[in-house]
Amino acid sequence: VWCVAAVLNRHAHFRYGRDEAGRIGIWDELHPYYTVPRRDAPDLFAMKVTRFTPDYDAFLSRFREDYARAETCGRLLCDETLPPNVCGISAMPGLAFSAFSFGGDPKPDFTPFVLLGKVHPAGDRTVLPVGGEFAHAVNDGGHISGFFKELEETAAKLFPD
């Protein structure tokens, strides 16, 4: 979650959004809004926001507290109110996918939505599938491929072999 948010926050083209009046602008930062499996109903999940900080250790401490709260909140939305500047991160921990397609209506905002799959071994490596939905109005192929490349580099620095 931190790696995704860190990469998105490094680049203005991933932080486009709309204010309450519908005006387009660039957020100073995005906070990850992510899914957490619920303890009371393992087939359901809860959604939680953790305020982003570029300091990994500080973020991890907040994330662990927020995650524990979300596991036991007993409902879909753990936060009473959400900041407008969030980036969605969801997980499908039971699926080791190689491709994924989002369907439905386009999102009304411009922030990316990132999907994480099942961590699994692949030869001598451990793989975490990652997919994403990006608004073509503000992100083109170069931005998107750059996101995935930088995400891989960020994770490799944080979790060296």
PLM feature spans:
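Residues in well-ordered beta-strands of folded domains
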Residues: 17, 33-37, 48, 64, ...
